[in-house]
């Protein structure tokens, strides 16, 4: 059952690509160089060989931090990274080799943040750190959409009390029903009103890419934003987190109108409000460099949402 859940079939991109050109110190093209990309979290390696034009491409990489190694006859081994690869992103990482013995290594760790120069797509990617650090109302990922340029909502509080025709952002002047929500490439839109049909725990998300314009043809069905959410996966190391968000009426300020209700004592004038939200994540390896799993749980006011995200790691060299 675990192995069956690990394989996801999707028409929407939930991975990234690393590409670039290999040259020597003079700028001349160097073909037939072996390029290896290593995922820092899972230690999974993906390899490719630069073609006659010195160009290499490593597609379908799970999001995360990567280091690339370049090895060619007559040149020192070159190591670049780590650097991030985001969902649906093409990272250009050119490699410059230095003449010398293969046993020698040139390591470059101060890598500039990759710029998105391969597409004209507009939008923004929210990392897991930014998502967990933000004071999102109700810990609802839809609230984060309001941080994206071009997104507005006349009633921001409605994201947690969504009824028909509410609870989402208006993006680039389009109606709120024109947004498209994807989770690991799977459509999670509410079939009745196109709201988000399933809201994962913020702590379960690796990153959220909000595309607002010039998206590729694979992301159809939306004139507004495409919200492409990617779940975390396990890694070779065991890791986890716990959280508890607490609010009640003792933490809220009183309102002008509540103060006018003199029939009630002062401590009863404010509307009763209590909110407890707690949960956590736990992930780690099942088999080192081969299989891992991540478990998450969130409870809000007695309603429990659980998510299991097993992941099969690709064999080294594939």
Residues of each region from the PLM?
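Periplasm-facing N-terminal accessory domains of Gram-negative outer-membrane beta-barrel systems
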Residues: 2-127
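Short, small-residue-rich packing micro-motifs
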Residues: 66, 241-247
């Amino acid at each position: 059952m675990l192995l069956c859940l690990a394989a996801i079939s999707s028409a929407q991109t939930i991975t990234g690509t690393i590409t670039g050109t290999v040259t020597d110190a003079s700028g001349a093209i160097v073909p037939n160089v072996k390029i290896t990309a290593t995922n820092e979290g899972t230690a999974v390696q993906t390899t490719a060989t630069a073609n006659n034009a010195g160009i290499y491409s490593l597609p379908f990489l799970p999001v995360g931090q990567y280091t690339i190694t370049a090895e060619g006859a007559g040149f020192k081994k070159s190591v670049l990274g780590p650097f991030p690869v985001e969902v649906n992103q093409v990272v250009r990482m050119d490699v410059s080799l230095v003449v010398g013995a293969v046993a020698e290594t040139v390591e470059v760790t101060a890598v500039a943040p990759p710029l998105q120069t391969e597409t004209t797509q507009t939008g923004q990617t929210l990392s897991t750190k930014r998502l967990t650090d933000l004071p999102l109302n109700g810990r609802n990922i839809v609230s984060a959409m309001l941080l994206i340029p071009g997104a507005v909502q006349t009633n921001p509080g409605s994201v947690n009390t969504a009824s028909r025709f509410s609870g989402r952002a208006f993006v680039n002047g389009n109606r709120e029903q024109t947004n498209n929500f994807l989770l690991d490439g799977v459509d999670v839109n509410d079939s009745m009103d196109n709201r988000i049909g399933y809201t994962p725990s913020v702590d379960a998300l690796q990153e959220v890419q909000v595309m607002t314009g010039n998206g590729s043809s694979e992301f159809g069905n939306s004139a507004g934003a495409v919200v492409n959410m990617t779940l975390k996966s396990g890694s070779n190391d065991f890791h986890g987190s716990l959280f508890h968000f607490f609010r009640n009426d003792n933490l809220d300020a009183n309102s002008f109108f509540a103060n006018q209700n003199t029939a009630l004592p002062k401590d009863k004038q404010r509307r009763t409000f209590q909110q407890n939200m707690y949960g956590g994540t736990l992930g780690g390896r099942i088999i080192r460099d081969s299989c891992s799993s991540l478990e998450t749980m969130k409870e809000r006011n007695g309603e429990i949402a659980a998510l299991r995200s097993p992941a099969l790691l690709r064999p080294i060299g594939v």
